[in-house]
Amino acid sequence: MGDEDWEAEINPHMSSYVPIFEKDRYSGENGDNFNRTPASSSEMDDGPSRRDHFMKSGFASGRNFGNRDAGECNKRDNTSTMGGFGVGKSFGNRGFSNSRFEDGDSSGFWRESSNDCEDNPTRNRGFSKRGGYRDGNNSEASGPYRRGGRGSFRGCRGGFGLGSPNNDLDPDECMQRTGGLFGSRRPVLSGTGNGDTSQSRSGSGSERGGYKGLNEEVITGSGKNSWKSEAEGGESSDTQGPKVTYIPPPPPEDEDSIFAHYQTGINFDKYDTILVEVSGHDAPPAILTFEEANLCQTLNNNIAKAGYTKLTPVQKYSIPIILAGRDLMACAQTGSGKTAAFLLPILAHMMHDGITASRFKELQEPECIIVAPTRELVNQIYLEARKFSFGTCVRAVVIYGGTQLGHSIRQIVQGCNILCATPGRLMDIIGKEKIGLKQIKYLVLDEADRMLDMGFGPEMKKLISCPGMPSKEQRQTLMFSATFPEEIQRLAAEFLKSNYLFVAVGQVGGACRDVQQTVLQVGQFSKREKLVEILRNIGDERTMVFVETKKKADFIATFLCQEKISTTSIHGDREQREREQALGDFRFGKCPVLVATSVAARGLDIENVQHVINFDLPSTIDEYVHRIGRTGRCGNTGRAISFFDLESDNHLAQPLVKVLTDAQQDVPAWLEEIAFSTYIPGFSGSTRGNVFASVDTRKGKSTLNTAGFSSSQAPNPVDDESWD
């Protein structure tokens, strides 16, 4: 997306240019009558409805796409609509005319005023998230020209085009038209611009031609990308794609809602028996109670209101380490309280040392930045920070993609001490110079292994290289995750001081033992039938179903609804409003089944999730561990069922056997046979004998038990079993 006029967004009184559209019939030789006011209201609607007159504020013609030169159809059929695309060669040639906005007879877009902003509702006239077109009307049109999603037109992969108004859609081929039941931006049926349902090879809106929306890069004249695909589970930079107008509703402000907390399960007390490994020199001793942390009274009151009475192992070790000012890499099982482990000591320091940011400062300079890979997770961290800082002078702010940039800026300028952000939106805000980095004392990477891999690693390196960002010697850097592969540990050295401490709680990279794991051998074409069978036996118990692709998430959710199983879906192609609505429906029981991609695999803490079903196994074992960690949290028990396809999942056999064995789960004989008949370089045949699945890559460790705090010097580390 181009540069946004955030000053106009912040000032709602600034006037915005609103383009005026003409009637839907062609009136002008070159279609250059975009701003002429109609003589009467009836002028917009007169004349019979024709296929050539596609819609108001729509495309130039229902036949303008699918040709190499869209102008050919216009010149031949002499028809156009006002407010959409003019004549010329703007589309149908795999891109834009000159890849920029132009005016004149051959303009691909109308020209916009420079003071246009996201707050203007007319900004809905533009491209939808996956390449479709919006005309500012959220309601669907009736009749054969019905629009799907939220006004988007596209083919199989988000391009332009609509099925023929005269063709009947085959329900077996097209479960959803364009967005369908779940409002997703992913249709199934491809179609060219002239109504044909067959694929085109050049200028059509189908999968094999034309503009494919978010999945296709558009190269501008300067050689830079105007649009770029976003990674699943993450977000794209706000400098790309259309402007976003969504403003999320504020969270409830009443004290009961702020301090609503997760109920611990019957196995919570078993945490005391988990072994803890601390690596590094001069590690401070662990604490046993919150009182030993010497926190201020307000913070202790908030801890009590939140229902925290007992420390988890990761909290016992991490809190004193952070209070001592040491850099930390902490690895603990899913659902073990890692968020509180870093928030509490950071807040304690800030309240003791005083804060610098306030709403009276023009440039906000937060003391702490917390970065997480997904929007849902970063919002969850913000709610925890707001809870623990309740009644204090510390103000937490959350910013993430999919929401209006102006809204994010307005939240920051009101005062920001702790900034919770996703990488893309954070870099946009820094680029707008709305925050300063000179006062940063704490940098936290949650789900750090994901933040440092190829998905977000470059953005994180850019962050620590930003002007004003204190060097790693002048700030405290904290990393938390349930999995820390060795290569990620090596990358982390660029962010951490050389004397950082490594805390490994229990089975590093291992699954939570409170989750009962079952692996079923199910072929690809038998999965749907098996899924329905399991869900019918489960009943209304809350269940998450994981699939590998966004398209399949919507397809499976639609299929389950047809089977009378209330289901919703969440994935990276859904608008943020839709993602939040889906999570809300699942969280509050309206839809007991949530079909998700990896966007929901990490960090999400949804109470009372009893089942996780891996409809598709992930590509890595680490992702498997994170997925099944959505259940069995805080000492509660859960169940995970995975469908193992012999044709596509053999590469996971050995690491899966190891995870099952380490978590003391039953291993099917057929899975062991596959595992030990498959050679994976670097993988040891033994699945037992090493207490920790992966260890600190440095030397000098002490293994401790959280119950007795006995320590013993561990021998020099041996080569790990590489199973990630």
Swiss-Prot record:
| Major place of residence | cytoplasm
Region annotation Interaction with RANBP9: where it falls in the sequence: 228-247
At which positions is ATP bound? Answer: 332-339
Per the record, residues carrying Phosphoserine are 222, 226, 722
* EC number(s) from the headed UniProt entry: 3.6.4.13
Q: In which tissues is it expressed?
A: Expressed only in ovary and testis. Expressed in migratory primordial germ cells in the region of the gonadal ridge in both sexes.
User: What name does this protein carry?
Assistant: Probable ATP-dependent RNA helicase DDX4
* Gene that encodes the chain: DDX4
